[in-house]
């Protein structure tokens, strides 16, 4: 077993060796290095064919048509293109957008930008289990609502929203529906030929592909229109200009092909590892799982260890790579906005750790991690006067703390 143990697969994944091998064929003079937009010679044709094959692999995984896949630099750009592209294109129809407070920053910050441009955004509060209230969603849709954007699976707590029902509601009310499926693609079955989803964002590096490449699914029937946010040679049917990075696209395609092949066996294995971890940690006193355990990604466990500071716990767990909050915001010491939105107090939100298992995680690593977490939590609580007071039965909420 190699230390440190990587349990932060929701932040990124190593690139699968099979993907690396495939990508290497599209880089050097000995390989297929052409520009897919070069229509006048073999180098361009071969590159274009490789892009087509990859586009088909990606479409196959999510039950889409390959013509509905638009390559971007990642899921963040796909989210930006979906929200800004749609809201700007349809602004004569209306200027109202609905999302949820627990969305990824790529959605929330884009919404803030749209608000600065004069659009109006409604932010739904999730229930305490992380799921949105579908009746509340119905009640906030207005005549001038253009788009609803609700993520499929949450990056911090792994909670899975019912995108089939949300899609039905949106289609019935003639509102477009975008979902950020960065965390769920390749882990949950997604069939866009059946789901009423108009736009879907995805990433490559959360599925053992390279970083720097992602895609936006844009539905053709009924046709969704959007305004480009990057202009230039009119690539990707005018929706996203820029020379296609063939090696990255091929890498993403191969990663998605492998995921489709292995999903049926890999997901039960990951769920078993996650449950093994949970069963090893749940007996620690004052630990709480954040988010629904039923509607959840099989590889995600987000736990708060009361009376332990999350940052100190992460430092004490030097041999395990985990995170508190999402990688995109873990640089700040603010408690997770996702957990605060679920109604957790600052203390519990601050004491949360996200464990996410993946393709290279073993049972041995899980068992080692359980032992490490148990001893670290015990050690930190032994140092904590708050833990002593709690054990003495003092209600910490009733104490008036004063500044001296």
Swiss-Prot record:
UniProt KW Membrane keyword: no
Which pathway does it operate in? Cofactor biosynthesis; iron-sulfur cluster biosynthesis
Return the PROSITE patterns for the record. AA_TRANSFER_CLASS_5
Cellular component GO terms held in the UniProt record: L-cysteine desulfurase complex
Where is the PTM N6-(pyridoxal phosphate)lysine found along the chain? Answer: 206
- Give a single Pfam family match: Aminotran_5
Q: What is its main location?
A: cytoplasm
Q: Which GO terms describe its biological process?
A: [2Fe-2S] cluster assembly
Q: Where in the cell is it found?
A: Cytoplasm
> Which cofactor does this sequence's record say it needs?
pyridoxal 5'-phosphate
Top EC class for this record: transferase
Q: What is its EC number?
A: 2.8.1.7
Q: Which reaction does it catalyse?
A: (sulfur carrier)-H + L-cysteine = (sulfur carrier)-SH + L-alanine
What GO molecular-function term can you cite, just one?
Answer: pyridoxal phosphate binding
The record's listing under InterPro entries reads: Aminotrans_V_dom, Aminotrans_V_PyrdxlP_BS, Cys_deSase_IscS, Cysteine_dSase, PyrdxlP-dep_Trfase, PyrdxlP-dep_Trfase_major, PyrdxlP-dep_Trfase_small
UniProt keyword list: 2Fe-2S, Cytoplasm, Iron, Iron-sulfur, Metal-binding, Pyridoxal phosphate, Transferase
Q: Which positions are catalytic residues?
A: 328
Q: What residues does [2Fe-2S] cluster bind to?
A: 328
Q: Which residues bind pyridoxal 5'-phosphate?
A: 75-76, 155, 183, 203-205, 243
Q: Does the keyword Iron-sulfur apply?
A: yes
Chain's role: Master enzyme that delivers sulfur to a number of partners involved in Fe-S cluster assembly, tRNA modification or cofactor biosynthesis. Catalyzes the removal of elemental sulfur atoms from cysteine to produce alanine. Functions as a sulfur delivery protein for Fe-S cluster synthesis onto IscU, an Fe-S scaffold assembly protein, as well as other S acceptor proteins.
Q: How does it assemble?
A: Homodimer. Forms a heterotetramer with IscU, interacts with other sulfur acceptors.
Homology family: Belongs to the class-V pyridoxal-phosphate-dependent aminotransferase family. NifS/IscS subfamily.
The protein's matches in HAMAP family, at most eight in alphabetical order, are given as: Cys_desulf_IscS
Q: What is this protein called?
A: Cysteine desulfurase IscS
Organism of provenance: Histophilus somni (strain 2336) (Haemophilus somnus)
